[in-house]
Amino acid sequence: MRFPNVGLAELSKSIIKIRGPDATKFLNGLVTSRLLPNVVKKKQHTISESENRHSNLSEIIDVSKNYGLMHEDIYDPDYNINISRDGINSMILNSKGRVVTDCFLYPDPFHNVDWVFQESMNEPGYLLEVDTSISQQLMMILKLHKLSAKVDIVPDKKLYSYYYYDDTATFDAWLENIQFKYFKSLDPTTALQNANSFIKDNVFFNQQIAKNILGFAVDNRIPNFGIKFISNKPISTNNDNDGQQDVIPVESLFSESFSQEFDTPTINESGVVQRRFQNGLFEIQDASKGSSLLPFECNLDYTNGLSLDKGCYVGQELTIRTFNNGVIRKRIFPVQFFQLTEYNISYLQDHPIDLNMSDPVVENLSNIPNSSLGKLEITPLDDSEPQQQQPPTNESPFASSPFGSSKVVRKRKTSLGKIVSVKDNLGLVMLAVSDVEKCQIYKLELPSFEGGTQFIGVKVGIPDWWPVN
């Protein structure tokens, strides 16, 4: 049994509104993405010709206005920077460079068709989307850093986050096309015009509900992975509408042209989560509470959430130093847990990881508390070193020798990886990159309630969307 190939799901996210004259500067000092137009380099000669093309960004972007967002990719050899009104993926770190939360950041509003959001366009405004489990802690952090900044920070429980995806080649091509047409502008004026055209052309949304769409983003954490949007009304199916006036019927959400070309079923959020796990896309709520993770361990550089030249922000020093050193030792990899049989081992050697909710290992793993997952030992599949026996010493009636013993010596085991999260027979595991390059099949030791231990297999997947080193 797999997750659905297509669907629309509501996400368990909280939305925080950040608005005011200093909103752009305030957020730029907290998130790992660049919001200000200046390029920061310690040495002028390190600015490449490609980067020099954007030296006039400060003339194009007025940060005191609601200009949208900059989009950049640190792995783009042409160093393209686009200005548009769709959202971006980012992270917020603590002072030690550890991840507080990942997030999506949207310009507020996305569009201004028929001047419906004209009042909001008068000053910088953003929607910060985070997992509901972290929202209260994040509010405390934001207020702590506010100081004298002229910003209003308000959680808005009347905003709703949704996710749509379609795992067909047709949708992938469609998504590529609309990005090229509507979200590759080079200045704020064109960015707003393109966003308005996206609504007026009935590309995705039905224009009749345009006043309800506050945020929009193409999820490019994985290229063309899906669409995210924020509405000011909940979306309902025919079954649960019950004549409510304060909802958007799902059949009224999508444009006629989109509905004719693509399926639009509603699904549970669990389908979105399973799809993330299979593709190796980590989110901070996947980890147990209190986990201490670095942004590169979470693959932030691979998911378009990092700017290298934006200047100072909280946690920047360790992050940039790690990148400049060029060595990232550990990353979170997607894995599949399986029963250790010769057939399974042989099959998975040549096949990608895959969701199987009926696999017996699902029950085995469900008996392990989340707090204990990280303590389980992952070792090489052929790790069967014999016990070492010390040479016997001469027996003495008086005392045992302090220099030797016939006692069996067990070599201390060292786990090669740490389980971050488990979903059915899939998981996310922290592993050394060098170990995965050598081997992708491991075994996991589980405690047995019947006494002793049991082992299950672990197949590590290397996502095909990761950049080639």
Swiss-Prot record:
The keyword Zinc-finger does not apply. This is Iron-sulfur cluster assembly factor IBA57 homolog, mitochondrial. Coiled coil: none annotated. GO terms for cellular component: mitochondrial matrix. NCBIfam families: ygfZ_signature. Keywords: Mitochondrion, Transit peptide. Residues 376-406 are annotated as: Disordered. Belongs to the GcvT family. CAF17/IBA57 subfamily. GO terms for biological process: iron-sulfur cluster assembly. It is found in: Mitochondrion matrix.
